[in-house]
Amino acid sequence: MLVLSKTIETEIREAGAKAYPNECCGILFGTGDGEDQVVRSLRPIVNARESGEQYHRFLITAEEMMAAELEARKLALDIVGFYHSHPDHPAAPSEYDRDHALPFYHYIILRVAQGEPEEMTDWRLRLSREAFDAEELEIEP
């Protein structure tokens, strides 16, 4: 299970609406054991994918990942996952998402339809990398 505050949920939804018709993306910082984790902070990332591909792909550069690792250390948190939006597509992982994901992390996907944030889901990639499993996403007040 992944737990988000209402504030963090709102930040993700606003990022998805602002980036539309392109994908937004970012990194989730949090605490917890391997099963249940709580997101305490996030780091919005500028989608580094070439502009013609941003409507259906996102890219977080190695430099951004290093900066996020350093930020996590300063905050005494872990990188627990990532978020991105799917403009005008379901809030479910694509084959591209599976090919570029790593087990152990949470992957929040936000459906943005015609610029309006809709369904938000959480996924984890199986160790075999054959498929994602849906995870419970809890929003705290």
Question: Language-model features: where?
Answer:
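Conserved beta-strand-loop surface patch within small alpha/beta domains used
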Residues: M1-I79, D88-P141
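Conserved, mostly hydrophobic/aromatic
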Residues: F82
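Residue-level "edge-of-site" marker
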Residues: S85
